[in-house]
Amino acid sequence: MYIVVVYDVGVERVNKVKKFLRMHLNWVQNSVFEGEVTLAEFERIKEGLKKIIDENSDSVIIYKLRSMPPRETLGIEKNPIEEII
């Protein structure tokens, strides 16, 4: 499955969330990560994020897709993701 993770978390947790997600996904731009994961990896990511965030004040949205969708970028692409064939 392909996931896109977007988050809005307290300043004191931003670096922890970013560091955690970098271990599993590709950084796209500020507060956005994406990548191909297995179901087990997806569950580990969810559980890891739950341990870091404050569910009463932070927000994490995870979009689940079957595969990497076509993408159109307006402006500069901060971290281009190349498809590996």
UniProtKB/Swiss-Prot annotation:
GO molecular function ontology, one term from the record: RNA endonuclease activity
Cofactor: Mg(2+)
Alphabetical keyword list: Antiviral defense, Endonuclease, Hydrolase, Magnesium, Metal-binding, Nuclease
Binding residues annotated for Mg(2+), in chain numbering: D8
One Gene Ontology term from the biological process aspect of the record: defense response to virus
Enzyme nomenclature, EC number: 3.1.-.-
Gene3D superfamilies: 3.30.70.240
InterPro entries tied to this protein: CRISPR_associated_Cas2 (IPR021127), Virulence_VapD/CRISPR_Cas2 (IPR019199)
CDD domains: Cas2_I_II_III
Record text on subunit structure and interactions: Homodimer, forms a heterotetramer with a Cas1 homodimer.
Family that this chain belongs to: Belongs to the CRISPR-associated endoribonuclease Cas2 protein family.
Function: CRISPR (clustered regularly interspaced short palindromic repeat), is an adaptive immune system that provides protection against mobile genetic elements (viruses, transposable elements and conjugative plasmids). CRISPR clusters contain sequences complementary to antecedent mobile elements and target invading nucleic acids. CRISPR clusters are transcribed and processed into CRISPR RNA (crRNA). Functions as a ssRNA-specific endoribonuclease. Involved in the integration of spacer DNA into the CRISPR cassette.
HAMAP family for this protein: Cas2
Protein name: CRISPR-associated endoribonuclease Cas2
Encoding gene, per UniProt annotation: cas2
